[in-house]
Amino acid sequence: MNFDVVIIGGGLAGLTCGIALQEQGKRCVIINNGQAAIDFSSGSMDLLSRLPSGQKVENVYQSLDELKLQAPEHPYSILGKDQVLAKAQQFEQLAQSLNLHLEGSTVQNHERITPLGGLRATWLSPNSVPTVKHLTALADKQVAILGIEGYHDFQPQLLADNLKQHSQFADYEFTIGYLNIPELDYLRQNSREFRSVNIAQLLEHKLSFQDLVQEIKQAAGNAKAVFLPACFGLDNQDFFNSLQQATGLALFELPTLPPSLLGIRQHRQLRSRFEQLGGMMMNGDRAVKAEFEGKNVARIFTTSHQEEPISADYFVLAAGSFFSNGLVAEFERVKEPVFDLDICGCKNFDSSDRFTWTNNRFAAPQPYQSAGVVINSACQVQKNGEVVSNLYAVGNVIGGFQGIEQGCGSGVAVVTALTVAEQIGGTK
């Protein structure tokens, strides 16, 4: 099999890159081994929330110069701030065309409310997710937080208690309630099946939609704003929007314990657009080895195609980090298993020295989380110190940053993905 571009990994980075390449007329295939990190995400996307020093970021553009001084190995520092902002804005346009219902701007981060009642700075959030801006706009300062009877992946009382700890919400009235939803009685019999995805699947046929509407209105009481667990609408936000329109209330949804419906929706919509554009998905397959001709990758082999190689002009590594086996930790070293590429990390990290992989403080950022492949300003990778000109890396497989601690995982994914699409599109 021969393609213009082979993309290894079907998460946020791989699909974003694939969509951009298909729009340029390239023939792409995505080798997808299973669920991606986006299926477990909050649905909000971070561009840069915190500098390595711990300083909070409000204006990303102004903070990128300081980031380069503190972390010259960070992918943003390597690409340059103008490229980072340009590709972030390009993704905003892509998200709008996909109808992902995302709100936010590269101009300034906003604060979203987390399921535990915390406030987290972020770049883009679904418009159904509550933010500080949403709450401060409420005239009556009354919010009903509604859970679902028997559903333990969302805790209304804990959320309310923690929100009251924030000074801006100290005078707000948070009321607690629970929805019964008789349709879910079958799931309640087995707690392991009582998850957000199962709930959404049972409710999506709208067999008792009006009963659900009335139950929400009754449980909300006098409150005009309602927080719900993200359990309503599996493929997209249409079910939730219909629910909001029918109740006449300002409904908001918060992500639950994984799997996260908000992330799953985004994943499905990205994948649908890629396939609509003619892209090919090889699901349940995994790249296992590659063959080189000279200094370039010629072909790869997968678990399902060990005798029939897949060749292409360009290859994009979007396999993610340890979570999805894009990186593997052996006793002696951290390695990238398909191409055996050069590995880097943040300061003081050495991929061949286990003692540099962890921090003595459990809650501190762990150095191994910054491990990943080495890239240049075009996102081309290195092997044995030399650039592989037709092999690129995107997303969390890249080294040199702490995606969780610095709040930049999603941003690195889409910025590098669109950078690679630009590089490949401009070279052929």
Swiss-Prot record:
Highest taxon of source = Bacteria
Give the pathway listed in the UniProt entry for this protein.
Polyol metabolism; glycerol degradation via glycerol kinase pathway; glycerone phosphate from sn-glycerol 3-phosphate (anaerobic route): step 1/1
Q: Which reaction does it catalyse?
A: a quinone + sn-glycerol 3-phosphate = dihydroxyacetone phosphate + a quinol
What biological processes does GO assign it? Answer: glycerol catabolic process
Fetch the InterPro entries from UniProt. Answer: FAD-dep_OxRdtase_2_FAD-bd, FAD-oxidoreductase_2, FAD/NAD-bd_sf, G3P_DH_GlpB_su
UniProt keyword Transferase, yes or no: no
Q: Which EC class is the enzyme in?
A: oxidoreductase
Q: Which GO terms describe its molecular function?
A: glycerol-3-phosphate dehydrogenase (quinone) activity
Q: Which GO terms describe its cellular component?
A: glycerol-3-phosphate dehydrogenase (FAD) complex
Which key words are in the record? Flavoprotein, FMN, Oxidoreductase
Q: Which Pfam families match?
A: FAD_binding_2
What is this enzyme's EC?
1.1.5.3
Q: Which cofactor does it need?
A: FMN
Query: Is Oxidoreductase tagged as a keyword?
Result: yes
Summarize the protein's role. Answer: Conversion of glycerol 3-phosphate to dihydroxyacetone. Uses fumarate or nitrate as electron acceptor.
User: How does the annotation summarize its subunit structure?
Assistant: Composed of a catalytic GlpA/B dimer and of membrane bound GlpC.
| NCBIfam families xref list | glycerol3P_GlpB, PRK05329.1-1, PRK05329.1-2, PRK05329.1-3, PRK05329.1-4
The family assignment reads: Belongs to the anaerobic G-3-P dehydrogenase subunit B family.
Q: What is this protein called?
A: Anaerobic glycerol-3-phosphate dehydrogenase subunit B
Its source organism is: Actinobacillus pleuropneumoniae serotype 5b (strain L20)
